[in-house]
């Protein structure tokens, strides 16, 4: 289990409370699909993913990105219990969707980039370290049900 200090929790929460989940979620998932095009195979039902502009403008990408980031909010509320928080999502992504767990790490790294672009100078090295620790812990929690 990962332990977060009070300072790390405060650093994560302070930015999260300022985040536009809908905007950042669509941007994060869109960026994942553009930068790592092999991840597109999990989103066949999303329609046109033929170019970066098609992906970033796709309403299904934006809607699912919001859903992903909304569930990430659960991580922030439950930083001391990530494994339990993501148990059902881990099972879904493992048993039904067959998502390569490496993709969780990629999405976490994309989220850190989104935070840096949105928050600029507020995204200090200390804040980045706290977020990097959180996205890594979430990726591990999501990969938990994999054999």
Swiss-Prot record:
GO biological process assignments: hydrogen peroxide catabolic process
Entry comment describing in which tissues the protein is expressed: Red blood cells.
Binding site for heme b: 64, 93
Keyword Metal-binding carried by entry: yes
Keywords: Heme, Iron, Metal-binding, Oxygen transport, Phosphoprotein, Transport
Function of the protein: The epsilon chain is a beta-type chain of early mammalian embryonic hemoglobin.
Protein name: Hemoglobin subunit epsilon
